[in-house]
From Swiss-Prot:
Compartment list: Cytoplasm
Entry keywords, A to Z: Cytoplasm, DNA-binding, Endonuclease, Hydrolase, Nuclease
Pfam families to which the protein is assigned, alphabetical: NucS_C, NucS_N
GO CC annotations, alphabetized: cytoplasm
UniProt entry tagged with the keyword DNA-binding: yes
Main subcellular localisation: cytoplasm
InterPro entries tied to this protein: Endonuclease_NucS, NucS_C, NucS_N, NucS_N_sf, tRNA_endonuc-like_dom_sf
Name this protein carries in UniProt: Endonuclease NucS
Species: Methanothermobacter thermautotrophicus (strain ATCC 29096 / DSM 1053 / JCM 10044 / NBRC 100330 / Delta H)
Cited NCBIfam families: PRK04247.1 (NF003270)
Record function comment: Cleaves both 3' and 5' ssDNA extremities of branched DNA structures.
PANTHER family per record: ENDONUCLEASE NUCS (PTHR38814:SF1)
Length: 253
């Protein structure tokens, strides 16, 4: 099947598959291949994937993926800005994807191509998301009273030894407040994470408050929170769709 934006070839010969794949890569099209193939990777490690029926996708931005018939993630992949090519060696068809920094190479041997296609896709829209921790952070920065009256945020994604604090702020008395955000029910691991952040600051000062913010919390997590002298705020993440550009403290300084 051929049209102005796509070309498809079923059970192509090696030369037909090569020409179609190279044409798709040259045109910066979305290349989709169903084939029996094997793969080898060399870079920060080494791996070998024996022959099997798989889906191969080469995207216009250089992304290269080999999918099996199970699981969400590809079994082999190369990130955007990798360089892909097809070539024939000793009568076999190969695909190669190379990343320069760090130096990585993924080679796929096509043993039998069942379907080769490419599509001149055009997609300029960003994903609209809602309900993540970043959305909660934006909402709290814009409406700090949701934490409590007098709360003043001073930093986001504040780096400490044990990770990144979602929001760092001060209460109306000037005491430091560490805010840990969870967009779903918070568990014991969230409490432990918050405690690590608070402990780092309590080594140098007194009056540090840790607040876990989530739409709900497990019974065990609430017990641990109270035992550690930490606090909980029940706040639902915003549900309105928005672009992936977040609100920063610069908007309010």
């Amino acid at each position: 099947m051929n049209c102005m934006k796509c070309k498809v070839s079923e059970n192509p010969s090696i030369k037909e598959a090569y020409r179609l794949i190279e044409d798709g890569i040259r045109k910066r099209a979305l290349v989709v291949i169903l084939a029996c193939c094997s793969a080898s990777y060399e870079g920060r490690a080494r791996s070998r994937l024996d022959a099997g029926e798989r889906l191969i996708v080469i995207k216009p931005d250089g992304t290269f993926m080999v999918h099996q018939d199970r699981k969400v993630d590809p079994v082999n992949w190369q990130p955007p800005k990798s360089r892909s090519r097809a070539y024939i060696k000793r009568g076999s068809l190969y695909l190669e994807s190379i990343r320069r920094d760090p130096e990585e190479r993924l080679e796929v041997e096509i043993h039998e191509a069942h379907l080769v296609s490419y599509y001149l896709a055009r997609d300029v829209h960003d994903l609209m998301v809602a309900g993540h921790e970043n959305d909660m952070g934006d909402m709290i920065i814009m409406h700090p009273h949701l934490i409590e009256k007098g709360f003043r945020p001073v930093a986001r994604e504040y780096a400490v030894t044990s990770g990144f604090i979602d929001i760092l702020g001060k209460d109306e008395n000037g005491s430091l407040m560490i805010i840990e955000l969870k967009s779903r029910k918070a568990g014991v691991s969230a409490v432990k994470q918050l405690k690590r952040y608070v402990d780092e600051f309590r080594e140098d000062r007194v009056g540090v408050r840790g607040v876990l913010v989530a739409p709900s919390i497990t019974h065990d997590a609430m017990e641990m929170l109270e035992e550690e002298g930490l606090e909980f705020r029940e706040i639902e993440p915003p549900r309105e769709l928005r672009s992936n550009r977040g609100v920063t403290l610069d908007n309010f300084l």
